[in-house]
Amino acid sequence: MQGNDSHWLPKHITDSSRMTGFSQPISGASRRRKLVLLATGGTVASTWSNAQGSMQDYSVTLAVEDLLPAISKSGSLADFHCVNLFSLPSHDIDCDHLLKIGQVSQAWLDNPEVDGLIITHGTDSLEETAYFLNLTIRSEKPVVVTGAMRPADHPSPDGPANLMGAVAVASSPMASGKGVLVVLNDGILEAGSCSKQHTTGLSAFDGMWEAQIGEVIGGNVLFRSAPTRRHTATSEFTISGLIGFPTVDVIYDHQSARSALYEASVASGCAGIVVAGMGNGSLSAGARVGALLAKE
């Protein structure tokens, strides 16, 4: 029903002659969207490691093909090409993985046979990946990032519904030109504003109302607004030619903060420091000392 391509590297993906792995239509339709499902791991592709079902005791065990039956049961709007890029919990995704996700995504989107892209991802760092892609991907095609709060073998998993919602959005012409979108719990969020607000709840991303620009209601896609900031095709950044990232540390300021963390960052060779400061950009005395040391 679905195609695989172990050659996910851009030099292979950009060859349109390799685009022979799309699934056959699940039900009758004259024009189905051709979507790439790019898997990176996360809870959506995880199963519990023991019978007790601990909230933390599960691991990534499923390929993206294993998630497709849930879509076929409801009738799909698209044909799929599956790419298993990683099988990682998202707290283990680093800058090298992030760069690879961006490069592979861009290569697929550049293929004229592809109508849109869905990325399955763990929710712990989903917002970082979505935001990075929103700044660096050059395409007006729909790009949707989705995941799950519950593992696939949970008695009531949310992954299938999230994936079906992602398919509906990625298949919708209305999603074109809106940048990278996050689809979870029937909400459509813009990547530039979304943030995980709850550790375990199904509505973990729902608290950022300013980020929610639409909904998936009964399989129908409804947009109420559109992102206003530059993104994707109009972004000042691009994935093209990017080969790595400088090391930048994030240091939180707080009462009685010390300058030692700034000194350690500089000594370790970081290229920059982002200070997560207090209201109106205020810094504690220790942070001011550390920032001045780092600036020298």
Predicted regions and their residues:
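ATP/NTP phosphate-donor binding region
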Residues: 5-108
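Accessory alpha-helical/coil subdomains and C-terminal extensions
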Residues: 31-34, 38-44, 60-74, 190-280
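Proline-centered loop/turn at the N-terminus of a beta-strand
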Residues: 34, 116, 141-144, 179
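Short beta-strand segments
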Residues: 38-40, 119-121, 144-147, 181-185, ...
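Short glycine/serine/threonine-rich phosphate/pyrophosphate-binding segments
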Residues: 46-47, 124-130, 159-163, 259, ...
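Short acidic, glycine-rich surface-loop motifs adjacent to enzyme active sites
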Residues: 111-126, 268-280
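Short Gly/Thr/Asp-enriched flexible loops that form oxyanion-binding sites at enzyme active sites
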Residues: 119-141, 283-292
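Internal gly/pro-rich beta-alpha loop/helix module
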Residues: 145-218
